Amino acid sequence: MNDCGSLFNKKLFKMNLLFKHLKLQQHLKLQQKPLLNNSSINNNINNNNNNNNNNNSNNDSNNTNTNIFNNSFLNSDLIERLIIKFTIGYLKNNITEDYIEQILLENQNNFIKSTTTSNYILEENNNNNNNNNNNNNNNNNNNNNNNNNNNNNNNNNSSSSSSSILSKFNKLEEDNELELQKKQKQQLEQQEEELFNQFNFLEGIEDQNDFLSEQETIQKIKFLIKMTAKSMSNYSSPNTLIPSVSKTYISPFGLSSNGSTNNHNNNNNNNHHHHSNNGNLIESSNNVNNQLNVSNYNNNNSNHYDENNQFDIFLIPTEMLVHLLSFLSANDLWRISLTCKRIWYIVDVFKFWELLFEQTCPRIYYAMQFNSRWSNPTSFQSKMILCYIDRLPTDNYKNFDKSDESGQIKKIIGVMNENLHNPMILRETCYILKRLSYRQRKEDEHESLIARYGGISLILQAMKNHPYDAGVQEDACGALGNLTCDSPNNMGLYSNDNYLSVVEQGGIQLILQAMKNHMMNPGVQYNTSFVLRNLARNDVSESRVAIEGGIQSIATAMKNHPNHIGIQTQGCGALRNLGCNDSNKVLSAKEGGIGLILRAMRSFSSHPDLQLNGCGALRNLARNEDNKNMISRQNGIQLVLGAMSNHPDDPDVQDEGCAALINLAYQDEANEETIAREGGINLILKAMRNHPFHSGVQMQGRGALKNLSCNPKNKLTIARSGGIELMNIAMQNHPNFANRFLELSRILQVALEDGNI
């Protein structure tokens, strides 16, 4: 039995000493961020040199609201008793899920959720297991009597579950003080020295100065936890909190994991004897409890260490575990969080994933804070991506751009490159690229970095590899839409050439194929319409989209999803850009595009973006004479005027509305009269008054008034309604176009003079 428990004792005392040496209980506070970096370790060590080991329990009780782990509760004597309690389960060698819950919830380490702090705190129940006491042998009657006396003394503490957190800690302090009073003063004074001696013996080193190297000690504990995490279950079942809890062991030279099924069967035996890994018979838990004490640990000559004996991760005290978890990488943190609910709650409460995400990928963390699908930065998707980044070979992110902080964007590209046949990974990486390319800050230029890293090619490859995966197609097209999104400058030129890369690499065919494969999927239809809208920027790309059947696909999407405002908006925008080509004007009308645009404008009259794109589409399509007549017959003029009336403060809607009226009124006397009769002149003048410094509104308003002034009655109405004054103001605010405003001003002045005569 001593051989079986020797390595176990050795490891526990090493961690116990480190925990006591750092005095983490003085620094962990829920109201502040946990000290999880290396600098906090050094601060803790420095503080330890200035603080005495005996702390005043009254000071701790006064600070209960700010420090949930007070010194009176976490004294070395209590930790020793916790270790002994958990050692019983280790030596019984029958740990199952139920037994772990029993140890964690019924004995010493009980996680409860505080109603005042909404966090989990550690509570000591001081209740022994009644089932184990009933199964004791007759030779242990004295031990049973002592345990029963302890239970009677602590009944008041265990029965106050509904009391406040402060009262619970006060009772715990009283129990701890009673326990400490029972010990001899000499044992309390020599405790630290004895533990130091035990550590030096158990470590097998002669020079005591080695223990004073805090960094080396921390590295050993860090390695211990990391190796333990490697032996745990992988993350193949992401949505399962705790798939199966089994006892996990670690040794310096080998790893093994004993299942809980056989151990559970052994627990049902009536002989209450258990066998260790090397075949030696182990006594029952109560007999072992009498032998596991400090005096046995000092028996140096009788211990022969078996390096193949293993260590149980579940025995680490919670406060120590909180500190040790901060050293783990993403992969190890995920594996260890699946071992039991206790560790899962610790990782969740202290926000280890969020801190790790923010430290390793700050740009991605910022981009993913504002999204619709990832409810918070520590969702399962973020955990999965962090784990894949952690295991990514360094060759995938070498030589990253200087503007790419820590190469985090290139790492995402590397994860895509390594998992081109994994649709789940591809969808999440495409979604990250979509969020990164959506420029939230002017200084961000992520779309150019993604293009230089070959992100566009990988996105298209993902679409090609998984044509029937709606999630991949949706997020891939969404990423392409943001990567190709750009606005023209004052000269009408675009600075983003990513759309050319998509067209040259066959992106149009893949996008249209996605629309055909997922016709009834609104997410796919929205993002494909969005990217087609951005691709139709010049004559070459417009023709390519039309030849491949893009206009038909867009019209079909608008027909199948009439109540989806996003699809209607992007569809109108795509038809708007495609309508710049003369042949596309005819094809759009043939496919029913005009009717679809007018229906969308009626259905979503209060949505400015849709009205903007609807007016823009009608503007381009109305340059065809047949289309202009079709728009007029279907009350398109009234819808354009309604958009201007409903959104007077939106300069873009006013701009496109005036532009649409220019083409609808061009050399068409009937439309000129209709526009004037429906109040179009007043709406144009109002737009120019409300937006005097918007060049688009001023120029398009001036053009609409000029076409309407071809009608003598309209000309006089414009002059008398303040049109001349507005032209003079526009000349001052926009001197580059002063000649055009002056021309219309003279025409109106002549009409006003003739009208007065």
Curated annotation (Swiss-Prot):
Biased composition (Low complexity) is annotated at 125-164, 256-270
Q: Where is this region: Disordered?
A: 39-63, 122-166, 256-285
- State the PROSITE patterns in the record: ARM_REPEAT, FBOX
Molecular functions (GO terms): alpha-catenin binding
Q: Does the keyword Coiled coil apply?
A: yes
Q: Which CDD domains match?
A: F-box_SF (cd09917)
GO terms (BP aspect): actomyosin structure organization; cell adhesion; cell motility; centrosome localization; culmination involved in sorocarp development; epithelium-like organization; establishment or maintenance of bipolar cell polarity; Golgi localization
GO CC, any one term? cell-cell junction
Which positions fall inside the F-box domain? 310-356
UniProt repeat feature ARM, residue ranges: 454-498, 506-548, 549-591, 592-634, 635-678, 679-723
Print the keywords alphabetically: Cell adhesion, Cell junction, Coiled coil, Cytoplasm, Developmental protein, Repeat
Name the phenotypic consequences of knocking out this gene.
Complete loss of cell junctions. Lacks actin-containing adherens junctions at the top of the stalk tube. Has weak stalks causing the fruiting body to frequently collapse. Displays multiple stalks appearance during late development. Shows no defects in growth or division.
What role is this protein assigned?
Required to regulate pattern formation during multi-cellular stages of development and for the formation of adherens junctions. Plays a structural role during the regulation of stalk formation. Involved in cell signaling. Required for spore-cell differentiation. Overexpression increases number and size of cell junctions and reduces spore-cell formation.
The UniProt entry's sequence similarity note says: Belongs to the beta-catenin family.
Name this polypeptide is given: Protein aardvark
In which organism is this protein found? Dictyostelium discoideum (Social amoeba)
